[in-house]
Amino acid sequence: MTTTLLRTADELHARVRHGRRAVVMTMGALHEGHATLIRTAREIAGAEGEVVVTVFVNPLQFGRGEDLDRYPRTLDADLKIAEAAGADVVFAPSADEVYPGGEPQVRISAGPMGERLEGAFRPGHFDGMLTVVGKLLHLTRPDVALYGQKDAQQLALIRRMARDLNFGVEIVGVPTVREDDGLALSSRNRYLAADERRTALALSQALFAGRDRHAAQEALRARAREVPATRARAEALSAIGESRAAADAHAVAKATPAGTSGPAAVRCAARLVLEEAARLQPPLVLDYLGLVDPSDFTEIPDDFTGEAVLAVAARVGTTRLIDNIPLTFGAAS
């Protein structure tokens, strides 16, 4: 199968469509994470459908002092990856094609959710992201659009935009793809020197420490519910402060203040890893660590039940990285 490169919306609209059209939006510099999105899109579209991959480095998403000029542009390599993963079309428009009158005067506002976490550190970023996603949805006219869960706040905002503005497109989130050592795949990973990459592992390690802490608490609560309300049950509950879900989380569990549980314990376990990474050379410089409700990205309270996202952003050298994992908090016993 040969992937077709298109540069204009007119070329894309002229294609005869059969079945569903699935779109994967990227800024290029494709890697295995993008390939996973494309393969998933191929499964959704089916043999009779069409998979379109957009490649567009959107200037509206980059703030002053960010890495627009050095963001990698590797279209030839991107075409090969997209073709191998099953894309029918790579749509790589110019800035003039997407913004024919220059930067748009009217933009889509991300609202309060877009001002939290990433939005607090990158003012205007989500407005620019939603504006180009909205334009690309209009230009590509898909039945379904797929986005990686690594950018959890972006995914949540796109879902909200599609719902609030009646875009009539199904939005699908695809799980984060990681290297063998846990580092989330990102186009920006190529900026990292070897020593910076070792420090960058602290992002995923912090998330895993929080996840393991949470799993240990849930396991002990489940065990305690099975024990009669006697001294044995009390001992099982009090053991939370010294238990661990895995051997490599034991030091974190020991360091967590006595009596800390629930979301507070998850935050504490993750933060301990990040604080240790801040003492490395080169150091990890934390932007934020949040344990949030994915519906609005506000911090969850200690009595929270339901789905949550543990998210982190940090800089190593000149490279800024983000990561997150989902967690589920059950009803208290």
From Swiss-Prot:
GO MF term set: ATP binding; pantoate-beta-alanine ligase activity
Q: In which pathway does it act?
A: Cofactor biosynthesis; (R)-pantothenate biosynthesis; (R)-pantothenate from (R)-pantoate and beta-alanine: step 1/1
**Gene3D superfamilies noted in UniProt:** HUPs (3.40.50.620), Pantoate-beta-alanine ligase, C-terminal domain (3.30.1300.10)
Task: Indicate which residues the UniProt annotation says bind ATP.
Answer: 27-34, 148-151, 177, 185-188
Query: What GO cellular-component annotations does this UniProt entry give?
Result: cytosol
**Superkingdom field:** Bacteria
Give the range the annotation lists for the signal sequence.
none
Complexes and interactors: Homodimer.
What HAMAP family does the record tag this protein with? PanC (MF_00158)
Q: Which family does it belong to?
A: Belongs to the pantothenate synthetase family.
Q: What's this protein's name?
A: Pantothenate synthetase
**What organism is listed for this UniProt entry?**
Streptomyces avermitilis (strain ATCC 31267 / DSM 46492 / JCM 5070 / NBRC 14893 / NCIMB 12804 / NRRL 8165 / MA-4680)
Q: What is the lineage of its organism?
A: Bacteria, Bacillati, Actinomycetota, Actinomycetes, Kitasatosporales
